[in-house]
Amino acid sequence: MDRKLEIIQCARELIEERGLAKTSVAAITERMNVARTLFYHYFPSKEDLVAAVLDTYVDEFIASLKEWNAQRVEGDIEGALDTIVALIRDQLFDNDNAHKPFRRALATHENASLYLQFINRVADASATYIVETTVADYGRLHEVRIDHAYETFYMLILGIVGYMRQHPEASDDVLKDIIAQTLHFEREREQSHHTA
């Protein structure tokens, strides 16, 4: 592993152990037993390093999204909705997940800017991936009845995540309905008549 990746990994471990506020450049270089000049050779500031750490979490989310996409059953809209809501809950909100300290740090007012960076990166990468794969697959079987697919998915992702953050008690059925209605999916009426 090259030194830059080692610094990112060390910072990530410290953030998960101590939280973001208690992870300093000094703590990182001390744990790695390297000079601060090496840190600054790769990262002009702690903020630049935090951005690189955020990218590792985004990459993991996208890897989970790719796995979800590979396991989707062609034509099974209900199954896809069930599993995507579960994926979002697990990857972004499950406090029993291994990234609990990082998620807790993101949820504080102190880190509101960091949260916005993270969620915008997730929305961008997810929307890009979904449009290039899932929407293309769907379009082979159904009419895609949304214009501006990337922008629609970007806004849907931001909206769903923001809503779930504010309303963690929201039922999966409501979340599935919001997704299906936004994307104009044809669903079985008996399965999609839930009220908000």
Q: Across the structure, where does each feature detected by a protein language model lie?
A:
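Amphipathic alpha-helical packing segments from all-alpha helical-bundle domains
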Residues: K66, E110-Y138, D147-E151
